[in-house]
């Protein structure tokens, strides 16, 4: 009975490894002229690293969008979401052919640094504005969830030239 369990265990392990490799193979690809997919990007905002997940048609570097004229959808998470990227991933994947998508992981969320500054609405929006500037995003549609709605409304008020549209999800 012990040999049988070991054999089953090996088969299950190999199957899991195979599933993992095949499931993640879309992340391992050669860089072409343009590509539809996902890129993980770190930018420096006010001396800290902020993580962004980019979905859509990316340029050869994978760092920016290939179709600059396409509407950019910026997604902001609810309070306490441990990984905004994972949280918004299914939605981003369903919309990435129609939009350039940026999932923002604000300081203290996901793979971004812990915030050095207080988490006030003004500070969070100043950081978001700096992130958009760093990415060269002049206008976007904000998609906000829960508490980010408060940040988003304040962002619209303080940076109206940057906001093309506003979507609140709860």
Short names for language-model regions:
Residues 2-12:
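Bacterial N-terminal signal peptides that target proteins for export
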Residues 22-36:
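Sec-dependent signal peptide cleavage junction
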Residues 47, 69, 97, 133-139, ...:
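Active-site acidic short loop of glycosyltransferases
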């Amino acid at each position: 009975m012990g040999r049988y369990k070991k054999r089953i265990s090996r088969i299950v392990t190999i199957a899991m490894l195979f599933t993992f490799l095949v499931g993640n193979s879309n992340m391992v690809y050669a860089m072409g002229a343009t590509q539809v997919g996902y890129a993980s990007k770190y930018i420096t905002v006010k001396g800290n690293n902020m993580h962004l997940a980019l979905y859509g048609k990316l340029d050869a570097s994978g760092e920016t969008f290939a179709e600059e004229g396409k509407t950019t959808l910026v997604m902001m998470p609810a309070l306490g979401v441990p990984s905004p990227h994972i949280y918004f991933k299914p939605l981003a994947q369903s919309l990435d052919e129609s939009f350039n998508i940026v999932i923002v992981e604000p300081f203290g969320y996901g793979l971004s640094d812990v915030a050095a500054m207080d988490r006030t609405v003004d500070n969070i929006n100043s950081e978001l504005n700096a992130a958009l500037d760093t990415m060269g995003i002049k206008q976007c549609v904000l998609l906000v969830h829960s508490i980010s709605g408060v940040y988003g409304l304040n962002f619209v008020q303080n940076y109206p030239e940057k906001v093309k549209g506003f979507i609140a999800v709860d």
